[in-house]
A protein has these predicted regions:
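Glycine-rich beta-strand-turn "strand-cap" elements at beta-sheet edges
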Residues: 1-11, 51-59, 85-108
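Active-site-flanking beta-strand signature of metal-NTP-handling nucleotidyl enzymes
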Residues: 13-19
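Hydrophobic pocket/interface hotspot
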Residues: 17, 29, 49, 63, ...
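Short, glycine- and small/hydrophobic-rich beta-strand elements in well-ordered beta-sheets
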Residues: 38-62
């Protein structure tokens, strides 16, 4: 799978992924994302991988991610454990998969 982030290839890639677990599957999704977090944070190109649940609806998940550059992001999305996670996640969430929102820093 190739996803091209809308940034200069040498700049950091920042995004958040969001998805909603099916009713009764939120804790299972939380356990899966906790395991994925350990793997992703070990990647040399990962800067930040912070999963969250919405307080008002714990079935809704948001993951804030930052990678060193586009190559580090591609390494993340092609990692074998990511493919296993995404395949399993598809049966536990609403819709077709995670919705990705690309981010760019606001200059200070």
């Amino acid at each position: 799978m190739t996803i091209t982030p809308p940034t200069n290839p040498d700049e950091p890639v920042a995004l958040y992924a969001e998805f909603t677990a099916l009713p009764g599957r939120g804790d299972e999704v939380a356990t899966m994302i906790a395991g994925l977090t350990v793997d992703v944070r070990r990647e040399p190109g990962n800067v930040t991988f912070d999963p969250h649940r919405r307080v008002s609806n714990p079935l809704e998940f948001f993951v804030y991610e930052v990678y060193r550059d586009a190559d580090a992001f591609q390494a993340n999305i092609t990692a074998p454990y990511g493919a296993v996670f995404n395949a399993a996640l598809g049966d536990l969430i609403e819709g077709e998969g995670s919705v990705l929102t690309w981010l760019t820093p606001v200059p200070a």
